[in-house]
């Protein structure tokens, strides 16, 4: 398929049609008019986990600063109510108990709040054991400070250890191809695990999203299989895997691709796998538009042998495709359906799709 012609003649690439799921798996859906408020804030932990790192750092820094400022105001209020701001702390009046030594200004109160929170040790400023209000406020600040530090530490650890980070090492091919396998046309894509640590229990599913004339989105399940593995799961994911969807007459893609000007659609692929070391489930997503489906192409070879006979993966060929000449379908007594496939308004050679049943 000539990419330059696609850019000129393809109505599906206009600004009116945008992705619902980006190539790296992020959703572009916008919730207009959604009622957030307190209901949204109830999931504070989930909000923090979904934040970008720069916003998370800003929120945590602001939390500490606000905590210090609030207790600085409280320490200043204790000194004000106790009459400690107007006296000489080095030579205090008789019968006067100073709650916190040398808190004579708000700056000093903020410094004392900082020392209390970080437990760096008191210097010239320290609370008096004879002032109950100071001891009570000290206990409250220490308790709330420990809770804040525990929450922030847990959030950092949880964000770093998320399975989502492991999913970033899973890579899909930028394009999907339609090529013949066993005499039948198949929609094919590849996925690679770019880290040496294997993944297990790999599952792949796909959903075809189509926009109807009334503006509603219609979802259709698209089944993919992996070579000759009969189960739905691939037990071991260390080298690149190739997934196939047979374009039979019952395939939702077969009906869609035979239109001269097909409506906009998006094929979203989901891959779930288990991390071998932790047992956590990670998921990776991508999507393919009609302009990203190449007919009569197949992927270049990836697996080679090294000098010592070991297997090697040539990742430089991961996104490469090579032209394929369509192979006629050979069957004893097939029911054939000729589909004139068009992508973005361009007529492509016919595919002969044969049903697997035999006539009597």
Swiss-Prot record:
Short motif (Selectivity filter): ranges: 119-124
Tissue expr: Expressed in retina.
Modified residues (Phosphoserine): 287
Transmembrane helix as UniProt keyword: yes
Regulation: Inhibited by Ba(2+) and Cs(+), although sensitivity to those inhibitors is much lower than in other Kir channels.
Any one GO BP annotation for this protein: potassium ion transmembrane transport
Residue ranges, Extracellular side: 78-105, 123-131
Keyword Phosphoprotein annotated: yes
Alphabetized GO MF terms: inward rectifier potassium channel activity; potassium channel activity
Reaction(s) this enzyme catalyzes, per UniProt: K(+)(in) = K(+)(out)
Topology feature Cytoplasmic, residues: 1-50, 158-360
Compartments reported by the entry: Membrane; Cell membrane
Function: Inward rectifier potassium channels are characterized by a greater tendency to allow potassium to flow into the cell rather than out of it. Their voltage dependence is regulated by the concentration of extracellular potassium; as external potassium is raised, the voltage range of the channel opening shifts to more positive voltages. The inward rectification is mainly due to the blockage of outward current by internal magnesium.
Protein name (Swiss-Prot/TrEMBL): Inward rectifier potassium channel 13
Source organism: Mus musculus (Mouse)
């Amino acid at each position: 398929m000539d990419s330059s012609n696609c850019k000129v003649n393809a109505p599906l690439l206009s600004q009116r049609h945008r992705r619902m799921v980006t190539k790296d798996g992020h959703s572009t859906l916008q919730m207009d008019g959604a009622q957030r408020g307190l209901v949204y804030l109830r999931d504070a932990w989930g909000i923090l986990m979904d934040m970008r790192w720069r916003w998370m750092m800003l929120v945590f820094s602001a939390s500490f600063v606000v905590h210090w400022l609030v207790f600085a105001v409280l320490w200043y209020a204790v000194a004000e109510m106790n009459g400690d701001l107007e006296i000489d702390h080095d030579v205090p009046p008789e019968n006067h108990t100073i709650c916190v030594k040398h808190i004579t200004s708000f700056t000093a109160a903020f410094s004392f709040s900082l020392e209390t929170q970080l437990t760096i040790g008191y210097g010239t400023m320290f609370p008096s054991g004879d002032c109950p209000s100071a001891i009570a406020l000290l206990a409250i600040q220490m308790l709330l400070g420990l809770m804040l530090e525990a929450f922030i530490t847990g959030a950092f650890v949880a964000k770093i250890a998320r399975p989502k980070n492991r999913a970033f090492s899973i890579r899909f091919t930028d394009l999907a191809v339609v090529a013949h396998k066993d005499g039948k046309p198949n929609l094919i894509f590849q996925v690679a695990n770019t880290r040496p640590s294997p993944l297990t229990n790999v599952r792949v599913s796909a959903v075809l999203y189509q926009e109807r004339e009334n503006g509603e989105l219609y979802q259709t399940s698209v089944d993919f299989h992996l070579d000759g593995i009969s189960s739905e799961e691939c037990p071991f994911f260390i080298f690149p895997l190739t997934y196939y969807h047979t374009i039979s007459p019952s395939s939702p893609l077969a009906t869609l691709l035979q239109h001269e000007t097909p409506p906009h659609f998006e094929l979203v692929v989901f891959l779930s796998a288990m991390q071998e070391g932790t047992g956590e489930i990670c998921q990776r997503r991508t999507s393919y538009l009609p302009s990203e489906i190449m007919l009569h192409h197949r992927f270049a070879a990836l697996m080679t042998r090294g000098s010592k006979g070991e297997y090697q993966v040539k990742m430089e060929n991961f996104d490469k495709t090579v032209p394929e000449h369509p192979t006629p379908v050979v069957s004893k007594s097939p029911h054939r359906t000729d589909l004139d496939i068009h992508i973005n308004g361009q007529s492509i050679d016919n595919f002969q799709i044969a049903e697997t049943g035999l006539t009597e």
